[in-house]
Amino acid sequence: MPKLVFSRHGLSEWNALNQFTGWADVDLAPEGVEEAKEGGRKIKEAGIEFDVAYTSVLTRAIKTCNYLLEYSDQLWVPQIKSWRLNERHYGKLQGLNKKETAEKYGDEQVHIWRRSYDTLPPLMEATDEGSAANDRRYAMLDQRDIPGGENLKVTLERALPFWQDEIAPALKDNKTVLVAAHGNSLRALAKHIEGISDEDIMDLEIPTGKPLVYELNDDLTVKEKYYL
């Protein structure tokens, strides 16, 4: 029976400061390191043995993946990194304090930017400070594929090819798979896996550093879902 484990990265430095993060390459906060280590211990206690691990190209997710594997005594497991598992790009909101942004634009508007399935944030230009267009880790991409901002719909469209080409085939081979990524890239994949509606996905929250286990049927429909 295929088994899939999602883990959002541990609390990041900008999570702790209540700032929009997106594609900004922010490190784990000390609390986030401990969350990731504890997640690894819970995986070990549950007896889950991975065949392959997938993560993004952002530091907070990569380190979380490493801690999860290290503290479950599986650091040798192959890891595959992809930009397609990156966090949702928050455009010009990246780096802004969420509370201050709500005071400026209103709680309702910020809630829509954060949780709506198909509303885009204010878009970042390629020439803006912090744009991924000049980041070496994305040098292999067509510039048109580098977003200036994303909603959850676009995040899913970006992540879905990686699911179809890499993750789903591994699961269909009956492998046990770890995906250590981000709140919104995991929400997007959860929407696809669970068939969550555009409306209901607004209410789905995935906590930091807490492994989410999917026990799947052979056709990759969900048999059981639970947190460790």
Swiss-Prot record:
Recall the GO molecular function terms of this protein's record.
phosphoglycerate mutase activity
Q: Which residues bind substrate?
A: 8-15, 21-22, 60, 87-90, 98, 114-115, 183-184
Q: Which Gene3D superfamilies match?
A: Phosphoglycerate mutase-like
What processes in GO biological process is this protein linked to? gluconeogenesis; glycolytic process
**Reactions catalysed:** (2R)-2-phosphoglycerate = (2R)-3-phosphoglycerate
Which InterPro entries does this one have? His_Pase_superF_clade-1 (IPR013078), His_PPase_superfam (IPR029033), Phosphogly_mut1 (IPR005952)
Which domain of life does the UniProt lineage start with?
Bacteria
Task: Give the positions the UniProt entry annotates as the active site.
Answer: H9 (tele-phosphohistidine intermediate), E87 (proton donor/acceptor)
- CDD domains annotated for this entry? HP_PGM_like
Enzyme category, top tier: isomerase
* Pathway(s) served: Carbohydrate degradation; glycolysis; pyruvate from D-glyceraldehyde 3-phosphate: step 3/5
What the entry lists under Pfam families is as follows: His_Phos_1
Keywords, A to Z, come to: Gluconeogenesis, Glycolysis, Isomerase
Q: What is its EC number?
A: 5.4.2.11
- According to UniProt, residues marked as the site described as Transition state stabilizer are H182
Q: What does this protein do?
A: Catalyzes the interconversion of 2-phosphoglycerate and 3-phosphoglycerate.
NCBIfam families the UniProt entry points to: pgm_1 (TIGR01258), PRK14115.1 (NF010713)
* Family the UniProt entry places it in: Belongs to the phosphoglycerate mutase family. BPG-dependent PGAM subfamily.
Q: Which HAMAP family match?
A: PGAM_GpmA
Q: What is this protein called?
A: 2,3-bisphosphoglycerate-dependent phosphoglycerate mutase
What species was this sequence derived from?
Answer: Enterococcus faecalis (strain ATCC 700802 / V583)
The upper taxonomy is: Bacteria, Bacillati, Bacillota, Bacilli, Lactobacillales
From the UniProt record, report the name of the gene that encodes this protein: gpmA
